[in-house]
Amino acid sequence: MSIKFFLLVSRQGKVRLAKWFNTLSIKERAKIIRDVSSLVITRKPKMCNFVEYKGEKIVYRRYASLFFVCGIEQDDNELIILEVIHKFVECLDKYFGNVCELDLIFNFEKAYYVMEELLLAGELQESSKTNVLSAVLAGDAESEADAQQDSLQKLVGSVKKR
């Protein structure tokens, strides 16, 4: 199982997250995003969640107003990828508390961080939601401590100048 790309696309076709696990030019990425988004968005809800695209498979799942889309090799297992997508959504739900599109727009770096804890080089790295969330929360605590230390140093620096 190797994911080539992971996209989050709104119903309007706006890309909310894009993670590429293969090296592609910006032009190729834009074409894939355009083609795959229009392919997935226009499908009816009762249709299969797997689509052929240029010798690859597209696996997608819709949650509320977002499509979670993965591009995989032809011989990879689609059902495992659906589970990976679901695991990612569950992790986002736990982290944000019932995640919505606005959470992903305004906190996209956190969503990427959750994805990076879950996936490594297109492979499932961590299957435990608890481990993923504890790593993300530890990173949050560390960045919070760094921010406090930076503001404290700025405050001390401004006092010394007086």
From Swiss-Prot:
Sorted UniProt keywords: Cytoplasm, Cytoplasmic vesicle, Endosome, Golgi apparatus, Membrane, Nucleus, Protein transport, Transport
Please state where this protein is localized. Cytoplasm; Nucleus; Cytoplasmic vesicle, Clathrin-coated vesicle membrane; Endosome
A single MF term (Gene Ontology): clathrin adaptor activity
- How does inactivating the gene affect the organism? Leads to hypersensitivity to valproic acid.
Q: CDD domains given for it? A: AP1_sigma
Functionally, this protein is described as follows: Component of the AP-1 complex which links clathrin to receptors in coated vesicles. Clathrin-associated protein complexes are believed to interact with the cytoplasmic tails of membrane proteins, leading to their selection and concentration.
Oligomer and partners: Adaptor protein complex 1 (AP-1) is a heterotetramer composed of two large adaptins (gamma-type subunit apl4 and beta-type subunit apl2), a medium adaptin (mu-type subunit apm1) and a small adaptin (sigma-type subunit aps1). AP-1 interacts with clathrin.
Q: Which family does it belong to?
A: Belongs to the adaptor complexes small subunit family.
What is the name of the protein in this document? AP-1 complex subunit sigma-1
